[in-house]
Amino acid sequence: MKMPLNIGLVHFIGIGGIGMSGIAEVLHNLGYHVQGSDQSDSANVQRLREKGIEVFVGHKAENIGDAEVVVVSTAIKKNNPELVAAREKLLPIVRRAEMLAELMRFRHAVAIGGTHGKTTTTSMVAALLDAGHLDPTVINGGIINAYGTNARMGDGDWMVVEADESDGTFLKLPADIAVVTNIDPEHLDHYGNFENVRAAFAQFVENVPFYGFGVMCLDHPEVQALVSRIEDRRIVTYGQNPQADVRFVNHRMDGAASLFDVVIRSRKGEATEIKDLRLPMPGQHNVSNATAAIAVAHELGISADDIRRGLGSFGGVKRRFTHTGTWNGVEIFDDYGHHPVEIRAVLKAAREATKGRVVAIVQPHRYTRLASLFDEFAACFNDADTVIVTPVYTAGEDPIEGVNSEALVSRIKTAGHRDARYASGPEALAPLVASIAEPGDFVVCLGAGNITQWAYALPKELAEQGKK
């Protein structure tokens, strides 16, 4: 049974969140009556209002109004006044992933999972299905530049969604195709240990129906180990690994664009080659993500020409190596990377894309993450000539003794880096960058906090610095 249209007013608590806003937008486009609230105004809130969705700023019991159903994300606390009011009214409380699962029942669905690369890969799958005239509905965890939004309502039979593994609810998603980009020990506060993370991803793939399949990265040791344990579902492997079913080869750079070929081999021995693919993004990690999208597209019957065209015009995702400006020949970028694996991949891509130097500005995100991955953070900046570390973005966490940005700078140095520095805040960045950066250099701002605002302000601040 699909969700009926007469379920009444649906109220989203935290509607401005990147995951919640996309679901609300698609529900609204399907004809459901949607409203919501968020603790602050934002671009997502404004976009929803422009589409005719009522959004309250601030959380109050009366915001519930005549709602018949309430949707919450894991970020909503149990004492939230709207959640308390909804429970008092005995309204159904629906988790974000459960509502996403209901939407997926309207379409055939591709779900993209993995510790890193989900948002970009989701966007790439959407772009290739779009190029193949399948007109997909898309719900992503980031703003897709081609759409200007994280959600898109298509008229086709397919839906492409990002599957967030952070709280285990991705196992509710009824996907026909499950993509796994990589598996790393993240979200242990929920899972307890890495073995439970592994088990969750195994279940994610095994949840696809017998006529579906998994698409899994053979370059990642944990994913390859998982492939060997999946016994009763069809798997399509991808990567640079010579054993991959869909393998990228001949990867080279053309400025900030990646050029590569793909070889597709069936288990019956047939081989297909797609040559001269161009992805307007640097980095082997992005080529790997593109190869995952190609694997999905090929299985769905999309032609090589459409794949080539879809990749060539791929516009990227906001906060994924996003260019924010130029100052004195210095290119400035903003990136969401906040885990050592992500940071290493982004800086490697920057190194490949420029003949100049790479300056990394990082805002560590959460004391708990910094504490649990301290040694990994100390060793992930090798491709940056200079590392500038700013204060930790707490995300509401209490400090942990001995775990701070100054300590990280010290550890980066003792791990062998030649130039790591501490900056006390955004006001210190422009003078510091102006004294370091030269024409041809890349400055990459990294983090999941408010460093994105600094990245967009930096070009102007550097220009002002030059006038002093």
Swiss-Prot record:
InterPro entries: Mur-like_cat_sf (IPR036565), Mur_ligase_C (IPR004101), Mur_ligase_C_dom_sf (IPR036615), Mur_ligase_cen (IPR013221), Mur_ligase_N (IPR000713), MurCDEF_pg_biosynth (IPR050061), UDP-N-AcMur_Ala_ligase_MurC (IPR005758). Its EC number is 6.3.2.8. GO terms for biological process: cell division; cell wall organization; peptidoglycan biosynthetic process; regulation of cell shape. It comes from the Bacteria. It catalyses: UDP-N-acetyl-alpha-D-muramate + L-alanine + ATP = UDP-N-acetyl-alpha-D-muramoyl-L-alanine + ADP + phosphate + H(+). Its main location: cytoplasm. Keywords: ATP-binding, Cell cycle, Cell division, Cell shape, Cell wall biogenesis/degradation, Cytoplasm, Ligase, Nucleotide-binding, Peptidoglycan synthesis. Pathway: Cell wall biogenesis; peptidoglycan biosynthesis. Pfam families: Mur_ligase, Mur_ligase_C, Mur_ligase_M. GO terms for cellular component: cytoplasm. It is found in: Cytoplasm. ATP binds at G114, T115, H116, G117, K118, T119, T120. One of its GO terms (molecular function) is UDP-N-acetylmuramate-L-alanine ligase activity. SUPFAM superfamilies: MurCD N-terminal domain, MurD-like peptide ligases, catalytic domain, MurD-like peptide ligases, peptide-binding domain. Cell wall formation. Belongs to the MurCDEF family. This is UDP-N-acetylmuramate--L-alanine ligase. It comes from Brucella anthropi (strain ATCC 49188 / DSM 6882 / CCUG 24695 / JCM 21032 / LMG 3331 / NBRC 15819 / NCTC 12168 / Alc 37). The gene is murC.
